[in-house]
């Protein structure tokens, strides 16, 4: 094993042989469930935004050269930049069982921490290869924490993409942190926890809004530094900033925290509903809430109006990729006048998305899971104006004359909150404008 720098309820349906699609019911609306061939992106991708967020953490992937090349390409960094992630590459002797994987991990970690003494939190990240040969990273993390715990905490999680969507890498990472969160004192005042990785600028915006409402005790998970892990307890109320954090939410609830039901903070409507859930839970009066949120709502509404001419009346089709599909469809339909033909999602968490589902029009087809060939047939037949899909489908669809938007770009870009509402709308408008310019 060599070290190479930077090259549930929340789980999607397991893949299987293609079968006839089945219809279920989600609330009072039909839901198309599909099982078959599906396209996914690797869960290791979450490291790209997580390593930028937790500034004293390091992510050590136990994987293959393919993992190393993926990370270098996805992150857009060079080896000499020494980013805070790397791949311990499984060699032939590791795969053949000729070397003790646990000893090799110990050796690589010791070298890493000697070279990078600034690391305070080390994640051992499982991959498809390490899971196939069943390397016990949880045992390795417990052992290494005893050895290096005075200076560096060691935690493990799986970033494998075998049966998950790429955003669930973040879910697995945050869920692994929850057991290490300190316990809040029983007599402490209620506090608010925002769960899900947000760009620092967005986190600061939300922090200011909560403070202006009088919610002073606000924390974010993940924090910017591992030494600032938030304390949680029965008086903790948490808001999910991302819809793909089912495991993390379940772990927080097991420790006594309570989730605040809310739509997700995309666009004016979603952001206002999300903030209102916190305001109601912490006793903020309506006058204060309206005063604090009015400037942001007005700025966002003006920004959205600039994109409405491009998007209004256009038809959009979502392939399942990130679990962001339902909140984004709600945003496009209700705030920009688009028509959603099909909203595909890898997994539909009914409780976490209840507020979003209530806002969707009954005409939109919801689909859970995927049989990619059948879904492509439906997409081609519908001829939508815009398709939101993964990288693997985008180029073939573009070659057929169908305009596409890469779904992964919606995860990498700041899109939450009032100030980013216009940017979010522009991400969808840009492919349509490009297509119009290319027409002869």
UniProtKB/Swiss-Prot annotation:
Coiled coil: none
Pathway entry: Porphyrin-containing compound metabolism; bacteriochlorophyll biosynthesis (light-independent)
Class of enzymatic activity (EC top level): oxidoreductase
An annotated Gene Ontology molecular function: oxidoreductase activity, acting on iron-sulfur proteins as donors
GO annotation terms (biological process): light-independent bacteriochlorophyll biosynthetic process; photosynthesis, dark reaction
Natural source organism: Rhodospirillum rubrum (strain ATCC 11170 / ATH 1.1.1 / DSM 467 / LMG 4362 / NCIMB 8255 / S1)
Residues noted as binding [4Fe-4S] cluster in the record, renumbered to the chain: 42, 67, 128
Reaction it catalyzes: chlorophyllide a + oxidized 2[4Fe-4S]-[ferredoxin] + 2 ADP + 2 phosphate = protochlorophyllide a + reduced 2[4Fe-4S]-[ferredoxin] + 2 ATP + 2 H2O
Task of the protein: Component of the dark-operative protochlorophyllide reductase (DPOR) that uses Mg-ATP and reduced ferredoxin to reduce ring D of protochlorophyllide (Pchlide) to form chlorophyllide a (Chlide). This reaction is light-independent. The NB-protein (BchN-BchB) is the catalytic component of the complex.
UniProt xrefs under SUPFAM superfamilies: Helical backbone' metal receptor
Protein's recorded name: Light-independent protochlorophyllide reductase subunit N
NCBIfam families cross-referenced by the UniProt entry: DPOR_bchN, PRK02842.1
Cofactor: [4Fe-4S] cluster
């Amino acid at each position: 094993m060599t070290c190479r720098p930077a090259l549930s309820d929340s789980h999607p349906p397991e893949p299987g042989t293609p079968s006839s699609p089945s219809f279920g019911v989600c609330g009072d609306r039909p839901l198309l469930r599909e099982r078959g061939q599906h396209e996914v992106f690797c869960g290791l991708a979450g490291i790209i935004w997580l390593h930028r967020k937790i500034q004293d953490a390091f992510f050590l992937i136990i994987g293959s050269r393919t993992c190393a090349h993926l990370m270098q390409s996805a992150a857009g960094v060079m080896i000499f930049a020494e980013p805070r992630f790397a791949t311990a590459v499984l060699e032939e002797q590791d795969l053949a069982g000729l070397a003790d994987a646990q000893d090799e991990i110990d050796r690589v970690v010791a070298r890493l921490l000697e070279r990078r003494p600034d690391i305070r939190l080390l994640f051992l990240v499982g991959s498809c290869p390490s899971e196939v040969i069943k390397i016990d990273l949880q045992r390795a993390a417990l052992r290494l924490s005893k050895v290096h715990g005075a200076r560096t905490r060691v935690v493990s999680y799986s970033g494998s993409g075998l049966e998950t969507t790429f955003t669930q890498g973040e879910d697995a990472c945050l869920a692994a942190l929850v057991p290490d969160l300190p316990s809040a004192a029983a007599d402490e005042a209620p506090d608010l926890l925002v769960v899900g990785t947000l760009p620092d600028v967005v986190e600061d915006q939300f922090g200011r809004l909560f403070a202006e409402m009088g919610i002073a005790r606000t924390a974010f998970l993940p924090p910017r530094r591992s030494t600032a892990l938030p304390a949680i307890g029965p008086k903790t109320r948490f808001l999910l900033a991302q819809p793909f954090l089912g495991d993390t939410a379940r772990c927080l609830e097991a420790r006594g925290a309570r989730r605040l039901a809310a739509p997700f903070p995309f666009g004016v409507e979603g952001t206002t509903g999300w903030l209102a859930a916190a305001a109601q839970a912490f006793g903020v009066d309506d006058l204060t809430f309206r005063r604090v949120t009015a400037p942001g709502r007005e700025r966002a509404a003006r920004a959205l109006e600039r994109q409405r001419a491009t998007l209004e009346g256009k038809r959009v089709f979502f392939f399942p990729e990130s679990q962001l599909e339902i909140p984004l469809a709600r945003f496009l339909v209700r705030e920009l006048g688009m028509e959603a033909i099909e909203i595909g999602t890898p997994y539909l968490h009914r409780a976490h998305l209840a507020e979003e589902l209530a806002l969707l029009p009954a005409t939109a087809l919801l689909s859970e899971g995927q049989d990619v060939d059948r879904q492509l047939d439906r997409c081609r037949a519908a001829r939508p104006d815009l398709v939101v899909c993964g990288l693997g489908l985008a180029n073939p669809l573009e070659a057929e004359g169908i305009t596409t938007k890469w779904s992964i770009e919606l995860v990498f870009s700041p899109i939450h909150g009032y100030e980013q509402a216009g940017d979010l709308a522009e991400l969808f408008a840009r492919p349509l404008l490009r297509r119009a310019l290319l027409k002869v």
